[in-house]
Amino acid sequence: MTDVVATNQTILVVGGGISGMTAALEAAECGKEVILLEKGPSLGGRVAQLYKYFPKLCFPTCGMEINLRRIKGNRKVRVLTMAEVTAVSGEAGNYNVSVNIAPRYVKESCTACGDCGKAVETEFADEHNYG
């Protein structure tokens, strides 16, 4: 049996909730390069939607602010929002991951004619229940 040693030891964390942010920070503080992937436009996940959370019954901003500052200050963490994993290949220790990143802006060539709105469906998922 041959052990595979990856030459690129970048860690991909999928999900930018509190757990994902914490996992990314812990790995980065151990010296690893980390890519934190979130499908939504911002980090925080369900906790960001809460009024207060257990055990201290504090507002989500108090706990999230600390993690967001740590992420911002850590050069080993790269955050990709509005991104989804489309394919994974490889084997343990050596994966290739394809990521689709959604656009964040309207191009300058847009004339606001309304054709784009007609071309796409207007059904939206229930964003509070993730589906």
Annotated model-derived regions:
Residues D3, T22, E26-A27, K39:
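Hydrophobic/aromatic ligand-binding patch that stacks against planar heteroaromatic rings
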Residues D3-S19, I35:
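Beta1/beta-strand and adjacent pyrophosphate-binding region of the FAD-binding site
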Residues N8-T10, M82, K107:
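Phosphate-coordination loops involved in phosphoryl transfer and adenosine-cofactor binding
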Residues V13, G20-T22, A28, C58, ...:
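Cysteine-centered iron-sulfur cluster-binding motifs in ferredoxin-type domains/subunits
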Residues I18, M82-T86, E91:
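Conserved SAM/SAH-binding loop
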Residues A28-S42, R46, S89-A92, N96, ...:
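Iron-sulfur cluster-binding cysteine motifs and their immediate structural context
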Residues A48-V85, V99, N129-G131:
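N-terminal glycine-rich dinucleotide-binding loop that anchors FAD/FMN and/or NAD(P) in oxidoreductases
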